[in-house]
């Protein structure tokens, strides 16, 4: 694993710890924390936010494609995907899951044809 991958995993793990600390059950204050407010509103509010961020990601990608996939428009894709990942991590935390659970699932699928993996889900 490269240093870049390790630091990326570290960032995700640290963020997961912060998200966990923002849960109202762990002392997160909805009046002082955006994440605590999302947790206090429940999973429908989190899911709505993920839907919004997914749409913004799609729109940023379309804008980047129209701009030749370079420059500031391409940078907006990264910005929107970061928002999408962040809110997906809030959802994971809401269900007691971590980024490591997702990474482990991706590792399980590594080297497996997408069509083969999809067929296995039907079993």
Curated annotation (Swiss-Prot):
A GO term, aspect molecular function: ATP binding
Catalyzed reactions: 1-(5-phospho-beta-D-ribosyl)-ATP + H2O = 1-(5-phospho-beta-D-ribosyl)-5'-AMP + diphosphate + H(+)
GO cellular component: cytoplasm
Cited Pfam families: PRA-PH (PF01503)
Cross-referenced SUPFAM superfamilies: all-alpha NTP pyrophosphatases
Pathway given in the UniProt record: Amino-acid biosynthesis; L-histidine biosynthesis; L-histidine from 5-phospho-alpha-D-ribose 1-diphosphate: step 2/9
CDD domains xrefs: NTP-PPase_HisIE_like
Main enzyme class: hydrolase
Location(s), subcellular: Cytoplasm
Record has Ligase as a keyword: no
Coiled coil location: none
InterPro entries named among the record's database cross-references: HisE, PRib-ATP_PPHydrolase-like
Keywords: Amino-acid biosynthesis, ATP-binding, Cytoplasm, Histidine biosynthesis, Hydrolase, Nucleotide-binding
One of the protein's GO biological processes: L-histidine biosynthetic process
Signal peptide: none
EC number from the UniProt entry: 3.6.1.31
NCBIfam families the UniProt entry points to: histidine_hisI, PRK00400.1-3
Family according to the record: Belongs to the PRA-PH family.
PANTHER family for the chain: HISTIDINE BIOSYNTHESIS BIFUNCTIONAL PROTEIN, HISTIDINE BIOSYNTHESIS BIFUNCTIONAL PROTEIN HISIE
UniProt protein name: Phosphoribosyl-ATP pyrophosphatase
Organism: Cupriavidus necator (strain ATCC 17699 / DSM 428 / KCTC 22496 / NCIMB 10442 / H16 / Stanier 337) (Ralstonia eutropha)
């Amino acid at each position: 694993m490269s240093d870049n991958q390790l630091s990326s995993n570290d960032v995700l793990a640290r963020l997961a710890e912060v998200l966990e600390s923002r849960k109202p059950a762990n002392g997160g204050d909805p009046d002082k924390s955006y994440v605590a407010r999302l947790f206090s509103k429940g999973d429908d509010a989190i899911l709505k936010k993920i839907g919004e961020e997914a749409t913004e990601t799609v729109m940023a990608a379309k804008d980047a494609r129209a701009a030749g996939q370079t420059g500031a428009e391409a940078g907006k894709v990264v910005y929107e995907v970061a928002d999408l990942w962040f809110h997906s991590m809030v959802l994971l935390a809401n269900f007691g899951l971590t980024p490591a659970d997702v990474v482990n699932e991706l590792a399980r699928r590594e080297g497996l044809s997408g069509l083969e993996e999809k067929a296995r889900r039907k079993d």
